[in-house]
Amino acid sequence: MSSHENSKNNMSKIILRDYQLSVVNETRKRLKDGFNHLMVQLPTGGGKTIIFSYIAQNAIPKGKKVLILTDRDELLKQAGGTLSDFNINPYFIKAGAKIIDHRKSCFIAMSQTLRKRIDKPDWQKWILDEIDIVIIDEAHIQEFNYIFESGLLDNKMVLGFTATPSRSGKMRQLGLDYERMVRGPQVKELVSKGFLVNCDTYDCGSPSLDNVSVNSQTNDYNYSSMAKQFDKPNLYAGLVKNYEKYTPGQKMLVFCCNVDHAIKTAIELAKKGYPVKFVSSRRAKPKEPEIGCTEGKIQKYKESVKAYEFYKESYDQLSGGRKSVLKWFKETKGAILINVDMLTKGFDEPSIEVIALNRATKSMTLYLQMIGRGSRVFKDKLNFTLFDFGGNAQRLGTYESNKEWGLWHEEKKGGSGVPPLKECGITSKSKPITGSGEVKKGCKRLIMASVSLCPFCGFKYPEPDPAKEIDLQLAEIKDANGVSIKVKSFKLMNYYELKTYRQIKEHTSAWLWRQLWIRGGEKELRAFANYDNWSGGTTQRAVGFCRGKF
């Protein structure tokens, strides 16, 4: 072990924030309690790399050896740079590394490289005999499953770090590899303290996703199937229109469905004269099919050639090498960068002011990784803007909303678990409404459906009129043949009639909640919830909505 690594007198260039020290102390407490495999959760931009570098710095002088695992080159370099700020000189294990420098006390390994070495006796012996602490960056991804399945970490101290400890579908459950979770502060707290910036979310509509296929392994939308729904002129025009209206000249990162979709999006923005590029993995030239192959294979080959030629032409005009494109994006004022999922993690560019989700996802992990790219504090940046073209915020919640994380993913009994949202100044029937305060026109940002005062612009919703909503309305209930069977006011309806009327009129859940609350408050609402077998989450959302409204 080098004296440089051992020296406790070397002052690091980084001082931990209070909440980061709290996370470190909670982690130490859990380890003392006997839990050796811990998942540490902290929002994107909260300083996970700083925390685990601090832990490594404190462990090395005690004779401990630390192995840090990551899955991307950017993360490798980022971790290496932060460790250097803590006066640690790590040994890098990446492509081409054939030997281990046993003199070192800290190692950073590309997971893909270690995977290729893991079956070799000398590498196994090194992990078993020398490594004391294993730190895993972006621990939620499945790339690291093999190291747990190997059994080499069974008796090691393992600390997994991620902003999104969540898996779904048929993925290996995190609870198989981690015993407990250490939770850091939520996004809302970090925003309030000035460590992250606030997000202004605009719901830009979404194409129908009813016919989009879902990947059974990831439980998320299939890329090519989704692209067919998003490859439409009105959506390309919508991105340009919203950018020009709300954030002209600001630096924007756009996420698309697939490479062709990313290229077409870049072309549309380039037509308007904006500085725009796309970045993607290099697309290889298709191989010619064998002689005598089926007509289907020939047709598929022709389609692949067409896509390759489109990519090649666009690559020369609107892209380039990954490093050069990212350098251009960093240095160019008002630059717009289009990608698919290449920049969801390990990409740190604080100057990003706008995130555009030109796609949909069912994955909370992917959703937060994408929008988290805009959350970092930078110079005079007070907030970042999210343009949501995939209904993601309605499906998964806003950036600041509290998230429930767990090591085991279980199917929910009902509801999405996401509080209902609304556009500021817009009614449930998508019509503008005049504010009752000084601000007469809403800002159209997404806000909680339960609030009557917009926290962004100060728009105040007019007070509802209970008499107008209930006493003066008559509801007509018809049987299966369309024959009228009852006409009565809402407050006199029984539960079956009220539920049936709502279904006939296709009213929202919020409409039903209001009727129940006005005629009997929380007690009436909970009684109906019991009658209709609502889940606990749905009941709580309904109560929260009504408490904020009335």
What is the predicted role of each segment?
Residues 77, 93-100, 264, 275-340:
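Conserved helicase ATPase core of P-loop NTP-dependent helicases/translocases
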Residues 284, 314-403, 408, 412:
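Conserved RecA-like P-loop NTPase helicase motor core
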Residues 34-55:
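Walker A/P-loop
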Residues 4-41:
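Conserved pre-motif I regulatory segment
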Residues 50-51, 60-85, 259-260:
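Conserved Walker A/P-loop ATP-binding site and its immediately adjacent core
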Residues 180-256:
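Conserved interdomain linker/interface between the two RecA-like ATPase lobes of SF2 helicase motors
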Residues 141-201:
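Post-DEXD/H (motif II) to motif III coupling segment of the RecA-like Helicase ATP-binding lobe
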Residues 223-292, 315, 319-328:
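Conserved helicase/translocase motor-coupling segment
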